[in-house]
Regions:
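Local cysteine-cluster metal-coordination motifs and their immediate loop/turn environment
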Residues: 27-42
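Short, well-ordered alpha-helical microsegments
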Residues: 120-121, 357, 387
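Short amphipathic alpha-helical interaction segments
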Residues: 352-366
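A short, conserved structural fragment
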Residues: 365-375
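N-proximal helix/coil linker or "cap" segments that precede and/or mark the start of modular domains
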Residues: 1-6
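Short, amphipathic alpha-helical interaction segments positioned at domain boundaries
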Residues: 382-399
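C-terminal scaffold of the Radical SAM
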Residues: 7-23, 42-66, 71-352
Length: 399
């Protein structure tokens, strides 16, 4: 059953999503094991009925195509979970159905997340043949002891081998690293990051370890058993080192945690950050869809089997929340200010119904906390460390 929550709206810009593009997110909820820091919707299953999952995805693609016909598709992202556990044949059929419904942009990007333990040359060749043209690999650390502490199932040697295999099949390969780990010091992070940058060709994501409630790490932290987490000062220094080393390697920050060579930024993630429309398919997937009636946030049921069964039964257990103009303005600023390029003043004026007052942030501009260039507002290097306050003041300037 589809549920709709209405919020008041003082005006809807039904074409605003075009400024950010259009993407499709496919959530594969299964993993070989649950990492202790992970708060994503991922599950360990003894067996998976691959055929029934494939057909559920195909049905949902058909349904959403009816709501978004005529759009040009910028990107597809297979996330999870561990999508590299999906058979290449499933990925092929999903992409075939997507291609049937939506024409692709000239620079169309299709990313699949992979863990080093689920990598083999034949599988990756199959993904490439299916139409995947970018891999995002969850390496997380180049230190074996830390991989064990993070609950990862691969070694550093296996990660490097998996990366090489991916490079043989794909022109674009990114990988994730986690810093501010237990007992980690800033200079040891610098050494590790330099090793990673020597491997990385065009894109790297570096995330600070966060302790989330509802995870194994969260439980240990609450019981005082998660020892050696860096002090805030050291964690901040590691963030600064990340900016320094990535920029020196020719991959500057284009988003808070993402670094890329020019022209190699993730197209799909920019659909999110530039506040475009995207379809979320799979258990727990979120989306943003604009219709003639307005813009909606969508969210599906978290439980894998409940989601799949609802698709087959035609119940479509998901929520559609109508986003008011204020909701859209807040989301636009929250997402866009994460990017180094920032947000368009013209679009800010449109979404705020002309209420943006530059004078209310002029002090922050003069203090070089907010930058201004070519009709864009962005957080400076100093402002990025104060991003929540920057966002607050920009939204306040739209009151």
């Amino acid at each position: 059953m589809q549920t709709v929550s209405e919020n008041s709206s003082r005006g809807v810009l039904v074409a605003d999503w075009r400024n950010g593009g259009f993407g499709v997110y496919i959530h594969w909820p299964f993993c070989a094991a649950k990492c202790p820091y992970c708060d994503f919707n991922s599950h360990v299953a003894k067996s998976i009925d691959q055929s029934s999952w494939k057909n559920a995805y195909l049905r949902e693609i058909d349904r959403y195509a009816d709501l978004t016909s005529g759009r040009v598709l910028n990107s597809v992202f297979f996330g999870g979970g561990t999508p590299s556990l999906m058979p290449p044949e499933t990925v092929h059929e999903v992409l075939e159905r997507i291609r049937f419904h939506w024409p692709k942009a000239n620079n169309f990007e299709c990313t699949l997340e992979a863990n080093p333990t689920s990598v083999d040359a034949g599988r990756f060749a199959g993904y490439a043949a299916a139409g995947v043209n970018r891999i995002s690999m969850g390496i997380q650390s180049l230190r074996d002891d830390d991989l064990v502490a993070l609950g990862r199932m691969h070694t550093v040697a296996e990660a490097k081998q998996a990366f090489d295999i991916a490079r043989n099949s794909f022109d674009r390969v990114s990988f994730d690293l986690i810093y501010a780990r237990q007992h980690q010091e800033p200079e040891s992070w610098r050494i590790e990051l330099k090793e990673a940058l020597y491997m990385a060709v065009d894109h790297i994501s570096a995330y600070q370890l966060t302790i989330e409630q509802g995870t194994a790490f969260g439980d240990r932290y609450n019981r005082g058993l998660l020892k050696g987490l860096p002090e805030d000062e050291n964690a901040e220094r590691m963030y600064e080192i990340t900016q320094e080393e990535c920029a020196a390697a020719g991959m500057p920050r284009y988003e808070v945690s993402n670094h890329a060579a020019p022209g190699q930024e993730s197209i799909h993630n920019q659909v999110y950050w530039k506040y475009g429309d995207y379809i979320g398919i799979g258990p727990g997937a979120h989306g943003r869809i604009t219709t003639p009636q307005g813009r909606y946030g969508t969210e599906t049921h978290l439980a894998p089997e409940i989601w799949k069964n609802s698709v087959y039964e035609g119940n479509n257990i998901e929520s559609w929340t109508h986003l008011s103009a204020d909701d859209q303005l807040s989301e636009f600023v929250l997402m866009g200010m994460r990017m180094a390029s920032g947000i368009s003043v013209h679009r800010l004026n449109e979404l705020s119904n002309g209420s943006f007052k530059r004078a209310k942030i002029s002090d922050l501009i003069e203090m070089s906390i907010i930058g201004e260039s070519d009709g864009m507002l962005f957080a400076t290097q100093t402002g990025t460390k104060l991003l929540n306050q920057v966002i607050y003041h920009i939204l306040d300037a739209c009151e």
